[in-house]
Amino acid sequence: MKLSNKSQALYDMIAPAVEACGVDLWGIEFLPQGKRSLLRIYIDRTVDENAEPVINEDGEVEQGRGIGVEDCVRVTQQVGAMLDVHDPISGEYALEVSSPGWDRPFFQLEQLQGYIGQQVALRLIAAVENRRKFQAKLLAVDLENEEIQVEVEGKHVLDIDSNNIDKANLIYQD
């Protein structure tokens, strides 16, 4: 679950601009695609259950609300202007900003901690038990040893090194 050097540099550059918009930077995907690259930014909002409700200028309660279109527009404008000034991406690129959604991708091991007991889809770099793709129940996240523990098909438990995870997503369930 490590970002490439280019993605990490972009993440470090973008994070302050995103947070200045009052939202959290959940993660980024930088996908070089020939002449036109794609920079996808995922934003989220941390909900403090103990916080007093906030009433915005329209008289709406903001506590516990997710990411809205207005948040994406604000971040797009802020980050877009910053990227225009610093120009860290050579050539043309498309900038997308969205919430992580129901099937949220995970970019850092710490992000998985809030989803213990839920189903995740994993794509590994190197095969484990002759497989690179798993749908499994997340049992534990070990930050010290940088690994996760999952239950595959309700049958057996696997410990997976986080450095072997190419991609991880939540599997949405009703």
Swiss-Prot record:
**A Pfam family name for this chain?**
DUF150_C
Entry's InterPro entries?
A: Ribosome_maturation_RimP, RimP_C, RimP_C_sf, RimP_N, RimP_N_sf
| One GO location term (cellular component) | cytosol
Q: Which UniProt keywords apply?
A: Cytoplasm, Ribosome biogenesis
Q: Which residues form a coiled coil?
A: none
One Gene Ontology BP term is: translation
Which locations, inside or outside the cell, does it occupy? Answer: Cytoplasm
Task: Indicate whether Repeat appears among the record's keywords.
Answer: no
UniProt function note: Required for maturation of 30S ribosomal subunits.
Report the family membership: Belongs to the RimP family.
Q: What is this protein called?
A: Ribosome maturation factor RimP
